[in-house]
């Protein structure tokens, strides 16, 4: 199937909070940690069809495990190339063009890569917002972000040990529903999702 990747950034007072001094900020890493924690249940909003899980297999540039990284298409949450770099990517790609002087720090995003075309967009975006907020609320968020960061292709044979240390995404709608049942209290907090709505998603 086709992926439905979601790029997101956190903005405060009109300023992108994803970078600090040219590197991914603590704010961004906490948000990523929240997504790492709730990733299994987010599939209930973003992968709602049995065939969704045929896509989430190794060597398809689709995620299979709960991890994140820079410019890495084997991870669940990817930090895209270029925005934090001091090099002008436009000039590198188009050497005959004059160097641009745009402030690209406002463009930095992170990309959630598990959802597909079966997603309920309203539920998915609400679920991602809940996950990011959850990352700000848990005390060990930065430890989670550190533990789930990978800088290798986890599906290459030499990285088997790293792969085994990472939690797996659900492999079916039934497994996804079980994950949502276990983590439902986080989504029901602050009345973002009602218990009846969560029940309906689980039963579906």
Language-model regions: role of each:
Residues 20-204:
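C-terminal accessory/tail domains of diverse enzymes
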Residues 12-21:
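Acidic, His- and aromatic-enriched active-site or binding-groove loops in soluble protein domains
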Residues 1-13:
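Histidine-centered divalent-metal-coordination microenvironment in nucleic-acid enzymes
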């Amino acid at each position: 199937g086709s992926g439905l990747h979601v790029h997101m950034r956190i903005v405060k007072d009109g300023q992108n909070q994803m970078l600090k001094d040219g590197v991914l900020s603590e704010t961004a890493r906490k948000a990523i940690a929240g997504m790492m924690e709730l990733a299994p249940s987010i599939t209930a909003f973003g992968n709602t069809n049995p065939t969704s899980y045929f896509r989430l297999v190794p060597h398809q540039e689709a995620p299979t495990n709960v991890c994140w990284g820079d410019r890495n298409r084997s991870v669940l949450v990817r930090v895209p190339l270029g925005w934090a770099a001091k090099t002008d990517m436009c000039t590198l790609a188009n050497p005959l063009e004059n160097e641009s002087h745009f402030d690209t720090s406002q463009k930095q995003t992170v990309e959630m890569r598990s959802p597909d075309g079966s997603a309920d967009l309203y539920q998915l975006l609400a679920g991602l917002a809940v996950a990011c907020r959850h990352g700000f609320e848990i005390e060990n968020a930065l430890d989670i972000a550190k533990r789930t960061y990978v800088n290798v292709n986890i599906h290459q044979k030499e990285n088997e040990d790293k792969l085994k240390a990472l939690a797996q995404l659900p492999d079916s709608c039934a497994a996804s529903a079980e994950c949502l049942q276990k983590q439902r209290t986080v989504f029901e907090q602050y009345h973002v999702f009602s218990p009846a709505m969560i029940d309906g998603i689980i039963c579906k």
